[in-house]
Curated annotation (Swiss-Prot):
Gene Ontology terms: biological process: FAD biosynthetic process; FMN metabolic process
Function as written in the Swiss-Prot or TrEMBL entry: Catalyzes the transfer of the AMP portion of ATP to flavin mononucleotide (FMN) to produce flavin adenine dinucleotide (FAD) coenzyme.
Cofactor field: a divalent metal cation
Pathway: Cofactor biosynthesis; FAD biosynthesis; FAD from FMN: step 1/1
Residues annotated for ATP binding in this entry: T11, F12, H16, P17, G18, H19, D96, Y124
Keywords linked to the UniProt accession: ATP-binding, FAD, Flavoprotein, FMN, Nucleotide-binding, Nucleotidyltransferase, Transferase
Gene behind this protein: ribL
EC number: 2.7.7.2
Cross-referenced Gene3D superfamilies: HUPs (3.40.50.620)
The keyword Nucleotidyltransferase belongs to this UniProt entry's keyword annotation: yes
One Gene Ontology molecular-function label: FMN adenylyltransferase activity
Domain of life: Archaea
Record's protein name: FAD synthase
Catalytic activity: FMN + ATP + H(+) = FAD + diphosphate
């Protein structure tokens, strides 16, 4: 029996419980989890700002997490390219991912004769720092205009 492969993708800039929730969800649905890390240049285009952590470091950090079997950098020219190379059985979208709607993603992949199951994590982890942006805002709030003590 072949191993079931799941793919999920994201920036994974400042890790928080929401990231881990999505990774665990994806791993529960497959034998192998491959994570596609958004490129710095892509993040800047989409979010209007560069990630705090460079792409290679984000890749290393994600690969170190227990649910993850492998991490790869996304394509600079075609966001479907890594998915077409990996050919996963399952694609997991995080609760806040808006790059693709499920029907649009399935339609795009079908043009390449790829028909994975596409799942969306419905549970949005609510905690004080449930997004990378919230973490950044708190750092600024605590440390802006203060002398850092090491």
């Amino acid at each position: 029996m072949e191993k079931k492969i799941a793919v999920t993708a994201g920036t994974f800039d400042l890790l928080h419980p929401g990231h881990f929730n999505t990774l665990n969800f994806a791993k529960k649905h497959a034998d192998e989890l491959v994570v596609i890390i958004a490129r710095d240049e892509t993040v800047k285009k989409i979010k209007g700002r560069s990630p705090v952590i460079p792409e290679e470091q984000r890749k290393i950090m994600i690969e170190a997490l227990k649910p993850v079997d492998r991490a790869v950098l996304g394509s600079l020219t075609n966001k479907l390219e890594p998915i077409l190379e990996i050919r996963p059985d399952i694609i997991v979208l995080g609760p806040d991912q808006t790059t693709y709607q499920i029907t649009e993603l399935k339609s795009q992949l079908a043009k390449h004769f790829l028909y994975p199951e596409v799942l969306k994590v419905e549970e949005y982890v609510r905690c004080p720092f449930h997004s990378s942006f919230d973490i950044l805002k708190e750092i600024v709030r605590r440390w802006c205009c203060k002398e850092l003590k090491v």
